[in-house]
Amino acid sequence: MKSLKTLLTALIIVASSAVLSTPAFAQYPPEQAIDLTVAKVQSAIDALKSGANADAVSDLIKDALDASKEINASDTVFVARTKGSNTLKNARKHLKEGSTKDAEQELDNALKAFSNLKKLL
């Protein structure tokens, strides 16, 4: 009887954790989250090209990083999203070092990476 209670408790825990998956908590569907992230990366690129200061561009990149966290579809998309996020982090690092040309190149790479995520859905 005691082992039956333990087994039932374990099954209830497994069932409840399966119901509460991370896509259920996502604020946007994956396609919309990708579009939002691409738009934010593009706004960071536009700001950098227009001569905005590094802090303002860094804040825009941070917004794009935050938006990218909403992209949640599959393991393949997660890996590709992580690569794009790492590219954005590199762009912020280059901005802090004062290398706007390298930051712009990283932002272009991030834009391509996030744009290609829709093909993985």
Language-model regions, residue ranges each:
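Long, charged/polar, soluble alpha-helical segments
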Residues: 2-6, 18-121
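Sec-dependent N-terminal signal peptides
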Residues: 5-13
